[in-house]
Amino acid sequence: MGDYTEHDRERMVVEGAKTAGLGSPDTEFTAGHRTQFARDRARVLHSAALRRLADKTQVMGPRDGDTPRTRLTHSIEVAQIGRSIADGLGCDPDLVDLAGLAHDIGHPPYGHNGEKALDAFADPYGGFEGNAQNLRILTRLEPKVLAPDGTSAGLNLTRAALDAAIKYPWGRTGPGTKFGAYDIDADRLAWIRKGAPDRVRSLECQIMDWSDDVAYSVHDVEDGVIAGRIDLRALADPQEQAALAAMGHRQHPELGVDELIAAAQRLSELPVVADAFRYDGTFASSVALKRLTSELVGRFATAAITATRAVAGPAPLVRYQASLGIPPIVAAEVAILKTVALRYVMSDPVHKQRQAAQRERIQAVATGLLATAPRHLDPQLLPWWVEADSDTARVRVIVDQIASYTESRLERVAAQLAG
């Protein structure tokens, strides 16, 4: 157990040796110092698509306060948490790290709110799903490698890397469902999934997904506390516990209301949580809040390692050799923390009003770009527009354009189109 194969390390396009070095193409740096998965991680790390996440909303907007988390900082945190779990289970840490960096790389401006707006615009033409856009960016849209026929292979990552980065390794099955590939990218998905069990995610992908949940639940609550939107004492209040549990059950129907109430109570009784009840922005309370986030991340990551080892044993685990174990009480704790952010930040009337304006802006830009295309399209997307032979293909180009925008650029284009 624990070995990656040549099949895992295969790339869609065979690449030649680098030629610009001062030594021979077979120098130690090229041939020995970097694994294929380390190269994959570097490609994601240096991509323009990753940098653009700095101006895309996580929960609080990129311009809300001095230190809000963005999609970029969130992705970096997911990568770090995932790397820690990978170290504990024997997966290649670079593989899980890059999956964390790439897991939101296809998200449009305004986060999940922008995703809803683009999905509504593109619904008759295959819809929009951030996870499917991840695959499209990694295998087509991010410029790095061309196939011999001149078509783009995107970053040309290894099979195992792409498989680790796809949360939902299947196509669209119906409205409102999560999926990892548009019909137009079915060939890419088939190549990635060659030899993989149907609808089963690799262990590296499961680690990335759990790390995403952990980062979301802990760090987004931290941002809400700092912004004055979340009071952690709600976790100890019976009335708020009941309200949170009811909302959490709607979001996570596999978890019962009583389980979620117990999770809130259990968290409220942890000394690190109680110490952060009275956050007021002072240095001491900031230390308490940071200790809370650190200890909760460790609690949730360690629980997954321990539960997985209890079933799979002590040997290094890779790919499809094991499933990640999540203890039910820990799953409930993460779910209740995610619900705290949902109830006190995302359900706020002012926040919802701003979200409505964001969706209208995306709809207006999408309609305007389609009506004036190809005038406002980026040069990189012009070949796709020229080759588009159907409304579905043309709408996909418009969606690719908007999904690539930062929030600042979207707002500039909206003003430009409005005249």
Curated annotation (Swiss-Prot):
Q: Tell me the keywords, alphabetical order.
A: Hydrolase
- Any one Pfam family here would be HD_assoc
Domain annotation HD: ranges: 71-192
Which GO biological process annotations does it have? dGTP catabolic process
Matches recorded under InterPro entries: dGTPase, dGTPase-like, dNTPase_2, HD/PDEase_dom, HD_domain, HDIG_dom, PHydrolase_assoc_dom
Provide any one GO MF term from the record: dGTPase activity
NCBIfam families (alphabetical): dGTP_triPase (TIGR01353), HDIG (TIGR00277), PRK03007.1 (NF002829)
Concerning its family, UniProt says: Belongs to the dGTPase family. Type 2 subfamily.
The family database entries (HAMAP family) matched by this protein are listed as:
dGTPase_type2
Q: Which PANTHER family match?
A: DEOXYGUANOSINETRIPHOSPHATE TRIPHOSPHOHYDROLASE, DEOXYNUCLEOSIDE TRIPHOSPHATE TRIPHOSPHOHYDROLASE
Protein name in UniProt: Deoxyguanosinetriphosphate triphosphohydrolase-like protein
